[in-house]
């Protein structure tokens, strides 16, 4: 829906997106098991509390890609991302000073119309 309405997706920050490649395991560490554990525990995932690493990553990505607005897409079944969307929205709008839209989907065809309407309106205000 974003591309179909003239927008450009510059980064996909979720469980299968950029965050998997952000922090690699330090292969030179003396304690390789500790380095592996450190890498996994520092992933900015919504199940981590506090989740400062996700905010830090989002801030870097917004700056690096010169983002005009954030569409935070979460799956209906991912309750931790849904709960965190309010604080992410506050971070994006107040700390980074750009518009934010939170959308929830189950990837069904029934969602297409609503998502298209919401994303079109969001892109028009950018």
Question: What do these predicted regions represent?
Answer:
Residues 1-50, 54-57:
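Redox- and metal-dependent alpha/beta enzyme cores, enriched for Fe-S-associated oxidoreductases
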Residues 49-66, 84-87:
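A short, acidic, amphipathic alpha-helical segment used as a generic capping/interface helix at domain edges
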Residues 72-75:
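Conserved beta-strand positions
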Residues 78-84:
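Glycine/threonine-rich flexible loop motifs
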Residues 86-126:
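Peripheral docking tails and interdomain loops at the edges
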């Amino acid at each position: 829906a974003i591309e179909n309405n003239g927008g450009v997706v510059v980064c996909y920050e979720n469980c299968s997106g950029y965050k998997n490649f952000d922090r690699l395991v330090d292969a030179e560490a003396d304690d390789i098991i500790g380095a592996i554990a450190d890498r996994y525990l520092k992933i900015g995932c919504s199940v981590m509390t506090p989740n400062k690493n996700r905010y830090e990553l989002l801030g870097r990505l917004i700056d690096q890609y010169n983002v005009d607005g954030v569409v935070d897409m979460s799956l209906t079944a991912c309750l931790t991302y849904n709960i965190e969307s309010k604080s992410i929205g506050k971070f994006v709008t107040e700390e980074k000073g750009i518009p934010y839209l939170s959308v929830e989907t189950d990837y069904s065809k029934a969602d297409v119309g609503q998502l298209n309407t919401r994303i079109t309106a969001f892109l028009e205000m950018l």
